Structure formats: C-alpha cells, structure tokens
C-alpha cells in the first residue's frame, strides 16, 4: 500500500531525531517534483494540500496521481489534509482514501477546539488515519487562511499537555513565532517555549511556516522535538519566479512541456534543500 498514514513515519522521525517534510502541492507538476525528488533522496514524504488545493485540482485526481507516482518510484507517502476545518469535509476525504489529516480549530476557544478535534480523532482513528491539530495560532496567509499578526497566539505549554490528553491527537502543531508566507524580517522563534512543550508532550511536534526560516532555526527546532516541517510559500515562489524568467527570455513560448521544466527544476532545488535540512535523506 503506497498511500499511508503519517503516524508511523513521524514516530520513526521522533525516535531517530530528524523531521519529515510536508510539501504543499497544487497541480501535476508540483506533485511530480516532490515525489520524484523524495524518491531520488530516499526521503519519507508528506504531500500536503489545503482545501483550496483539493478544490482546484480535484480530490480524486490528487489521490490517483499521487498513488501512481508512489508506485512508480516505490515510495510510500502520506497525502495530508492541511488546515481543514470541517468534520464533514474530512470525513468525505478519508472515505476517498486520505490517511493523514490536520483539523484546524485554532480560531476557536480552547474548549471548542478540543471538542472539534476530539470528534475528528474519533472518526479518523476508526480508519487508521492520523490526526494533527494546532494549539495557538500562526499569523500570515496561506490560501484562504488569513490571520493578522495581532491575532497570532503562542502555544501555552500547560494547555498543550491538556490538549493532547483530551483529544488523543497523533501530532501537535505549535505556534512559537513562525508565520505562514515569507518573512519581511528574520523571525525570533521561542525555543524555550518549544523545549517546555517538548517536556510536557510526548507526541511528534509540527512546525508550520517554515518557508524562509534560517536553516539553523529549523535544525534547532528539530533538536527540540519537531518531527514534521511544513513548506508551502517557498515552493510557489521558486516555481513562479522561474516561469516568469522563462517568459522574459522566451516571450513567444507556448509549450508547457518546455516552460514547465525550469519551474520544476527551481522548485526541486528547494525540495532538496529542505530534505537535507530536515536530516531525512536516506531514511526510508
């Protein structure tokens, strides 16, 4: 079976001290890049998509193409629902073959967040589907998710312990100073807070908003318990910048088989870098 839960791969990463990258994809080309590159580097892989991605590309298309690529490259992978907010939406996608889910109730008060997440866990675990949830709230923009910096909240370590105990989640997304999108200035991550969370929570931790972070920060976060690193915006920028440059140099170009190649190559370099920083090359 090539479409798998992310639970075992994150537990393996936790025990071995590396992280698994979760790359957000949007279409055939971006899916090809992340699978082909992970296969070349023999890296575990989580392919992530927001609700907007699944609406754009088609749920069945993503599952079918990812499954075909996984078989072609002999690379078991997780297709992950990133920042999903609806239990009904999650239920339908799990029934279609998804086995890795993030339920995002971080915009709710603590008790409501717990109740929503618990309902998702109760459903997903019946189908061997792993569940990630977020406590605290990241600022920034990702697809339709927009959180003003003034509304961002850091994860409370004591609440994190309660949250994990009451929900039964498999991984916890923490807010320690990262944000969705690229950074206007170098962020200051609260590693002391992360260490406190790690001391109180024994499940894998997840770092959202890794695009543009210094490599040293990512490595330090991994040393403090982060087992999954999410990258989205940095991939889109590399891909689109290469496309723009190609058309500047070739204004009459019209063959996607040609102009997609430099875009895919630019994105591949980012994927290779992230896999290297996560320390997961050769970990299959």
Curated annotation (Swiss-Prot):
Binds 1 zinc ion per subunit. One of its GO terms (cellular component) is cytosol. Pathway: Carbohydrate metabolism; D-tagatose 6-phosphate degradation; D-glyceraldehyde 3-phosphate and glycerone phosphate from D-tagatose 6-phosphate: step 2/2. Zn(2+) binds at residues 83, 180, 208. It comes from the Bacteria. GO terms for molecular function: tagatose-bisphosphate aldolase activity; zinc ion binding. The keyword Transferase does not apply. Its cofactor is Zn(2+). It catalyses: D-tagatofuranose 1,6-bisphosphate = D-glyceraldehyde 3-phosphate + dihydroxyacetone phosphate. The active site is at residue 82. Belongs to the class II fructose-bisphosphate aldolase family. TagBP aldolase GatY subfamily. Catalytic subunit of the tagatose-1,6-bisphosphate aldolase GatYZ, which catalyzes the reversible aldol condensation of dihydroxyacetone phosphate (DHAP or glycerone-phosphate) with glyceraldehyde 3-phosphate (G3P) to produce tagatose 1,6-bisphosphate (TBP). Requires GatZ subunit for full activity and stability. Is involved in the catabolism of galactitol. This is D-tagatose-1,6-bisphosphate aldolase subunit GatY. It comes from Salmonella paratyphi B (strain ATCC BAA-1250 / SPB7).
């Amino acid at each position: 079976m090539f479409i798998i839960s992310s639970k075992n791969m994150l537990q393996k990463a936790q025990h071995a001290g590396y992280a698994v990258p979760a790359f957000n994809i949007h279409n055939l080309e971006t899916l090809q890049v992340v699978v082909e590159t992970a296969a070349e580097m023999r890296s575990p892989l989580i392919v992530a998509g927001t609700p907007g991605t699944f609406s754009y590309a088609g749920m069945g298309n993503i599952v079918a193409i990812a499954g075909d690529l996984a078989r072609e490259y002999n690379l078991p992978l997780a297709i992950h629902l990133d920042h999903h907010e609806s239990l009904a939406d999650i239920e339908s996608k799990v029934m279609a073959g998804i086995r890795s889910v993030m339920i995002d109730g971080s915009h709710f008060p603590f008790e409501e967040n717990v109740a929503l997440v618990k309902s998702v866990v109760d459903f997903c675990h019946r189908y061997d589907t792993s569940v990630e949830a977020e406590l605290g709230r990241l600022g920034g923009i990702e697809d339709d998710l927009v959180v003003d910096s003034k509304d961002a909240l850091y994860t409370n370590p004591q609440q994190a312990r309660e949250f994990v105990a009451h929900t039964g989640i498999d991984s916890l997304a923490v807010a320690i100073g990262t944000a969705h999108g690229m950074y206007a200035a170098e962020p200051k991550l609260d590693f002391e807070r992360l260490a406190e969370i790690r001391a109180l929570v024994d499940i894998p931790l997840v770092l959202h908003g890794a695009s543009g972070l210094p490599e040293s920060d990512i490595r330090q976060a991994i040393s403090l318990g982060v087992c999954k690193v999410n990258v989205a915006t940095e991939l889109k920028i590399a891909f689109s910048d290469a496309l723009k440059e190609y058309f500047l140099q070739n204004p009459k170009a019209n063959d996607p088989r040609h102009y997609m190649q430099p875009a895919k190559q630019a994105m591949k370099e980012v994927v290779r870098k992230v896999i290297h920083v996560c320390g997961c090359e050769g970990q299959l």
